[in-house]
């Protein structure tokens, strides 16, 4: 359960992004979501999975508030789902919020930090997310942040939306970023 200090950190938007460490990878592999979001549960802990998560080519980053791991983001091909059309130039973003923090209105602040980091770190003028259509909670968050659906496709009987947003179309908050 997040502490009062952690809640105040969210209010102050003082989130820190840094390349994912082995310890952070092992911690997030223990995250378990309640149905219907259990579909997002990470794979079981293994040396191979940890090695993939900390491999710089996948650009996984921890997101921390008061040194507590609250979320993660990936930048690049990991944010793509087989079957989508990703030919237009954009930075693909994958993300996850700690299960204990979901559904509490904190996603917008985390997403804002991710978008600011992406704008500072990657040359693309466009951010792109791929989201399962059943995840209406995430879709509402992305739409409120200015993302627009540009494509729908199905992979392994799951419908997805690809959503895009021009970077630079938001107000900036305080953010400490530690690029890879």
Predicted feature locations:
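Conserved acetyl-CoA-binding loop of GNAT-fold acetyltransferases
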Residues: 143-152
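Terminal substrate-recognition subdomain of acyl/acetyltransferases
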Residues: 2-10, 154, 158-180
